[in-house]
Swiss-Prot record:
Annotated function: Involved in the restart of stalled replication forks, which reloads the replicative helicase on sites other than the origin of replication; the PriA-PriB pathway is the major replication restart pathway. During primosome assembly it facilitates complex formation between PriA and DnaT on DNA; stabilizes PriA on DNA. Stimulates the DNA unwinding activity of PriA helicase.
CDD domains xref list: SSB_OBF (cd04496)
Keyword DNA-binding appears in the UniProt entry: yes
InterPro entries the record matches: NA-bd_OB-fold (IPR012340), Primosome_PriB/ssb (IPR000424), Prisomal_replication_PriB (IPR023646)
Protein name per the record: Replication restart protein PriB
UniProt keyword Nucleus, yes or no: no
Gene Ontology biological-process annotations: DNA replication, synthesis of primer
GO CC terms, sorted: primosome complex
Gene Ontology MF term list: single-stranded DNA binding
Subunit structure: Homodimer. Interacts with PriA and DnaT. Component of the replication restart primosome. Primosome assembly occurs via a 'hand-off' mechanism. PriA binds to replication forks, subsequently PriB then DnaT bind; DnaT then displaces ssDNA to generate the helicase loading substrate.
Length: 104
């Protein structure tokens, strides 16, 4: 089964870094995406806020460059996480992160 998502946008929540009891580092943040997409011959506004989690040592170095306002492209897979309140939310598990040059 295919489960791939590529999403670009702006980090809109301060990254939260934790280390699991087994020693695996995790970085969590929220990515806000806004774009204009074409559907059925019409232009429509597309918008979402997607929670992102970066796990493992491989991508942790780049997460230290990520702050609120950073423009990035994230590639990975999606999965549901159950919150403490019992509600499920979709989360993007990042496997590759690229900083988007702001052109400044």
């Amino acid at each position: 089964m295919t489960n791939r998502l590529v999403l670009s946008g702006t980090v809109c929540r301060t990254p939260l870094r934790k280390v699991s009891p087994s020693g695996i580092p995790h970085c969590q943040f929220v990515l806000e995406h806004r774009s204009v997409q074409e559907e059925a011959g019409f232009h429509r506004q597309a918008w979402c806020q997607m929670p992102v989690i970066v796990s493992g040592h491989e991508n942790q170095a780049i997460t230290h460059s990520i702050t609120v306002g950073s423009r990035i492209t994230v590639q990975g897979f999606i999965s549901c996480h159950k919150a403490k309140n019992g509600l499920s939310k979709m989360v993007l598990h990042a496997e590759q992160i690229e900083l988007i040059d702001s052109g400044d």
